[in-house]
């Protein structure tokens, strides 16, 4: 998501809800609730010449069964458009596609062939299958989104279209208590335009329309049992922005290349910075060096917690903290034609309950009621105002602000560089397996 912010900044998508439920239910029941054609047990008799049968003798008959008819409603083999087929129907074995596997380098190269490390890797199968399922959902949803997002659409249409697809493919519409905690949308869909780098998702009534000249960062997450896949890409229709996007994409790939067990976080940031600053982009006749946004970082990911505590800088730093075996990281980079530094601005949409929130008395009744809704529907997963609207909550802003002021809920306002600048983002989730590094969200697109 949702980049982690440093310095003074804080650390840290809906159509008719019924349509989402119907879509998910329809996909989930595909092959189960539709009437199935019965295999025929009728037999036909086929005359054959019997051995030693005399002329005019009776012909022996050989029984031949009809071929069984194909069952109506058999599990689909391909995803629908828009994506609405439950992913487990496409992978009935429960085995999901493996991400990009990258061998460890240097002193960790032995891990590739170590029998002990391969054994430990096999022990993580359930953990990995949940991550791979979430990653495949992310790939299928973004494939459709990238092909269908066009100028003229509202940001609300774009965000809710992505979120509806995620809910359908996970089979978790998120309207029943606890359903979204089992799986579904991991955090609000970010649709960040131009100088807005992160944490912008439309609130109710937002009429902002995507234009041809915009640069939009699309940052969305999928989770299965709290295993969060966090991946982001940037869309630009005008080719003059191509170098900006390429700089950030390659910087992210550099970060992935340098990441690994025992890799020092500060050194990863140095390599990312070198890659990004090697690019220039000409926009409207003016040339800019692409700058890393120095107070935005990648981060580790824990179960049901998008920011675990470790930060992966995108500029050189003295951080000697090492990555460790079994950890999961979001490697994300942001490039800008502006100051290369973001600040809080605009109306807030992103919120999350603080994991170790204080137990304090709440004088505002609506705050206690809202906290109960948050606990039962999101836990520590980030949410936005639209998600509360979708659950039928109203007149909740006073209570929400009270939870924020008491330190129970953290607000995450949009993060912006200077107005008139352009920013880009690319992000992948990686798993540091015992015997290799798996770029779990890697696809053919990025």
Swiss-Prot record:
Residues holding substrate: 199, 307
Record note on cofactor: Binds 2 divalent metal cations per subunit. Has a high-affinity and a low affinity metal-binding site. The true nature of the physiological cofactor is under debate. The enzyme is active with cobalt, zinc, manganese or divalent iron ions. Most likely, methionine aminopeptidases function as mononuclear Fe(2+)-metalloproteases under physiological conditions, and the catalytically relevant metal-binding site has been assigned to the histidine-containing high-affinity site.
Major subcellular location class: cytoplasm
CDD domains noted in UniProt: MetAP2
Any one GO biological process: proteolysis
Subcellular location: Cytoplasm
Necessary cofactors: Co(2+); Zn(2+); Mn(2+); Fe(2+)
Protein residues bound to a divalent metal cation 1: 219, 230, 427
Renumbered residue ranges of the record's region Disordered: 1-91
Biased composition (Acidic residues): 36-48
InterPro entries attached to this UniProt entry: Creatinase/aminopeptidase-like, Met_Aminopeptidase_Type2, Pept_M24, Pept_M24_MAP, Pept_M24A_MAP2, WH-like_DNA-bd_sf, WH_DNA-bd_sf
UniProtKB keywords: Aminopeptidase, Cytoplasm, Hydrolase, Metal-binding, Protease
Residue ranges, compositional bias (Basic residues): 59-72
Enzyme class: hydrolase
Single GO molecular function: metalloexopeptidase activity
Catalytic activity annotation: Release of N-terminal amino acids, preferentially methionine, from peptides and arylamides
Cellular component annotations (GO), alphabetically ordered: cytoplasm
Binding positions for a divalent metal cation 2 per the UniProt entry: 230, 299, 332, 427
Keyword Cytoplasm: yes
Main function: Cotranslationally removes the N-terminal methionine from nascent proteins. The N-terminal methionine is often cleaved when the second residue in the primary sequence is small and uncharged (Met-Ala-, Cys, Gly, Pro, Ser, Thr, or Val).
NCBIfam families associated with the record: met_pdase_II
This protein's name: Methionine aminopeptidase 2
Source organism of this protein record: Sclerotinia sclerotiorum (strain ATCC 18683 / 1980 / Ss-1) (White mold)
């Amino acid at each position: 998501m949702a980049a982690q912010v440093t310095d003074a900044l804080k650390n840290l998508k809906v159509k008719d809800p019924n349509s989402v439920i119907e879509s998910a239910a329809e996909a989930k029941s595909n092959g189960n609730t539709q009437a199935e054609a019965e295999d025929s047990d009728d037999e036909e008799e086929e005359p054959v010449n019997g051995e030693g049968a005399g002329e005019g003798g009776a012909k022996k008959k050989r029984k031949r069964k009809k071929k069984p008819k194909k069952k109506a409603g058999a599990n689909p083999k391909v995803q629908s458009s828009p994506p609405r087929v439950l992913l487990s129907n496409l992978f009935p074995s429960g085995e999901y596609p493996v991400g990009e596997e990258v061998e460890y380098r240097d002193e960790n190269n032995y891990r590739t062939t170590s029998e002990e490390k391969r054994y430990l890797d096999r022990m993580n199968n359930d953990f990995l299958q949940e991550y791979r399922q979430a990653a495949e959902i992310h790939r299928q949803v973004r494939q459709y989104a990238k092909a269908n997002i066009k100028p003229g659409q509202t940001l609300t249409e774009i965000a809710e279209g992505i979120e509806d697809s995620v809910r359908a493919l996970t089979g978790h519409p998120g309207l029943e208590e606890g359903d979204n905690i089992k799986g579904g949308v991991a955090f609000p869909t970010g649709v960040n335009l131009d100088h807005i780098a992160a944490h912008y998702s439309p609130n109710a009534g937002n009429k902002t329309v995507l234009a041809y000249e915009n640069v939009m960062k699309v940052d969305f997450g999928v989770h299965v049992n709290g295993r969060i896949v966090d991946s982001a890409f940037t869309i630009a229709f005008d080719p003059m922005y191509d170098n900006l996007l390429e700089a950030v994409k390659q910087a992210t790939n550099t970060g992935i290349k340098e990441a690994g067990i025992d890799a020092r976080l500060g050194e990863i940031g140095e390599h990312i910075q070198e890659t990004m600053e090697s690019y220039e982009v000409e926009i409207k006749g003016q040339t800019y060096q692409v700058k890393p946004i120095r107070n935005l970082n990648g981060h580790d990911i824990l179960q049901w917690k998008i920011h675990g505590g470790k930060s992966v800088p995108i500029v050189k730093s003295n951080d000697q903290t090492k990555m460790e075996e079994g950890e999961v990281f979001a490697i994300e980079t942001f490039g800008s034609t502006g100051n290369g530094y973001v600040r809080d601005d605009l109306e807030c949409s992103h919120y999350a309950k603080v994991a170790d929130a204080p137990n304090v008395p709440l004088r505002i009744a609506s705050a206690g009621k809202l906290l109960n809704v948050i606990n039962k529907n999101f836990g520590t997963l980030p949410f936005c105002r639209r998600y509360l609207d979708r659950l039928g909550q109203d007149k909740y802003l006073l209570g929400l602000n009270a939870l924020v002021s008491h330190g129970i809920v953290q607000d995450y306002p949009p993060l912006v560089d200077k107005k008139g600048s352009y920013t880009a983002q690319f992000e992948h989730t990686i798993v540091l397996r015992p015997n290799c590094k798996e770029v779990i969200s890697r696809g053919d697109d990025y």
